[in-house]
A protein has these predicted regions:
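Terminal targeting signals and extreme-terminal segments of soluble enzymes
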Residues: 1-132
């Protein structure tokens, strides 16, 4: 993501997965996804990579919303804890910046399922690059 570019976090992969931006600003972002059959693993549960992608997208957008014009950010690492299985319905990721230096941002995303059940918590470190 680069300031002045798309910045919505809804890149090609996010669109392919059906991830939708809901809100973004002031170091926060919310993205949603409707679970589809092709999101399920062979056990009938949403694949962890889908939940991870939703959290990553929300965290990147949250940090992007706090960047200066011309800056960009990219994921360095993410740790995710899966707390409950999801088999259908809606998923929502709410992300926020919890720490920042000149070159890195630390973010948290909480992913909720239908009824507000917490299904995953992720923390991520992102690299911040200045305009060239």
């Amino acid at each position: 993501m680069t300031a002045g570019g798309s910045g919505t976090g809804a890149g090609a992969l996010a669109r392919l997965l059906g991830i939708r931006p809901v809100s973004m600003g002031d170091g926060r972002a919310r993205f949603e996804l409707t679970v589809r059959e092709d999101h399920l693993n062979p056990n009938g549960v949403v694949h962890g990579g889908i939940v991870y992608s939703l959290a990553d997208t929300a965290m990147g957008a949250a940090l992007f919303s706090a960047l200066e014009p011309g800056q960009s950010c990219t994921t360095l690492e993410i740790k995710i804890n899966y707390l409950a299985p999801v088999t259908s319905g809606e998923l929502a990721a709410e992300a926020s910046v919890i720490g920042r230096t000149k070159r890195t941002g630390v973010l948290e995303a909480r992913v909720h399922g239908d009824g507000g059940a917490l299904v995953a918590v992720a923390t991520g470190t992102f690299y911040i690059q200045s305009a060239r």
